[in-house]
Amino acid sequence: MVVLGSTGSIGKNALKIAKKFGVEIEALSCGKNIALINEQIKVFKPKKVAILDPSDLNNLEPLGAEVFVGLDGIDAMIEECVSNLVLNAIVGVAGLKASFKSLQRNKKLALANKESLVSAGNLLDISQITPVDSEHFGLWALLQNKTLKPKSLIISASGGAFRDTPLELIAIQNAQNALKHPNWSMGSKITIDSASMVNKLFEILETYWLFGTSLKIDALIERSSIVHALVEFEDNSIIVHLASADMQLPISYAIDPKLASLNASIKPLDLYALNAIKFEPISMERYTLWRYKDLLLENPKLGVVLNASNEVAMEKFLNQEIAFGGLIQTISQALELYAKKSFKLSSLDEVLELDKEVRERFENVAGV
């Protein structure tokens, strides 16, 4: 298999599962963590390696592997790979072209890069995609019973770092505080996306493209992250998916469903140790971006705008140029502005063009 983004949280877990399942690693890619990819090269001996920045070439120790550089280099590497499976764990819209290239080459795509579906779900062949995500894995597991007819799909949210912060203090929070996730250990972008509820907006759009544009889709807060998904059926019964908060479960099924079903990759749940599972609505007062959920489901192509404005605001937030309120404000302004416009988005180029336009427009907007 090919692992793109091998030095991140998902990538490291994927390599752990691949080793356990005896899956050969044909190719690896990383962003800036050259020290770690050098270690991974020693262990997994890939035939091909891609890095983002040519200035890192001097520090790379490829041990005979063919080396590719930049996003175009990743595309070229995928083109040459013979593996049937590509796991795309690149962060941000940077992973979009790699998803397209993998599907063009008729490869199965294990997709951890949320931005691919969020920005271009209408252009991707969903039949070749397995989402690497605890919520969508939960929905997939619940929908295996074909006798029951689903009516609504519900995913859970932890509430993120500011779920108990006094409302009047949320806007002034900094990145350091946003990175204190109560349940999961993840990369910085997804942890902040969890605090802003952007991550759940992403997952709502992913659910729309993956499981059905005709079903009701919603989310709720379940603080323990033990409940990942719920499906309500036409008979008004609801089935719930519970599992430990561990990404190795969805990753293992994306790599090899048969082996995953026979080998436990996560700790069993101790049902007696569970606190009372409690569901809470997502408060629009606390998570102001949640008010755009219905707008995004009505016009899912706005996902490009959501993602581009979020990435621009995220960079400023991490660089301490704006506080949390500024991040929220940037995304709100972008969605309000583009909700009034119409756009086709019938090709990858058109998606990337709109992405660029949104970035340029909001790059220089002063935040709170």
From Swiss-Prot:
Name used for this protein in its record: 1-deoxy-D-xylulose 5-phosphate reductoisomerase
Family matches, as Pfam families: DXP_redisom_C (PF08436), DXP_reductoisom (PF02670), DXPR_C (PF13288)
InterPro entries hit by this protein: DXP_reductoisomerase, DXP_reductoisomerase_C, DXP_reductoisomerase_N, DXPR_C, DXPR_C_sf, NAD(P)-bd_dom_sf
Cofactor (UniProt): Mg(2+); Mn(2+)
Catalytic reactions on record: 2-C-methyl-D-erythritol 4-phosphate + NADP(+) = 1-deoxy-D-xylulose 5-phosphate + NADPH + H(+)
Annotated pathway: Isoprenoid biosynthesis; isopentenyl diphosphate biosynthesis via DXP pathway; isopentenyl diphosphate from 1-deoxy-D-xylulose 5-phosphate: step 1/6
Binding site residues for 1-deoxy-D-xylulose 5-phosphate: 114, 134-135, 158, 181, 194, 199-200, 203
Binding locations of NADPH: 7-10, 31-33, 113, 115, 187
Binding locations of Mn(2+): 133, 135, 203
Cited PANTHER family: 1-DEOXY-D-XYLULOSE 5-PHOSPHATE REDUCTOISOMERASE, 1-DEOXY-D-XYLULOSE 5-PHOSPHATE REDUCTOISOMERASE, CHLOROPLASTIC
Species name: Helicobacter pylori (strain HPAG1)
UniProt EC number: 1.1.1.267
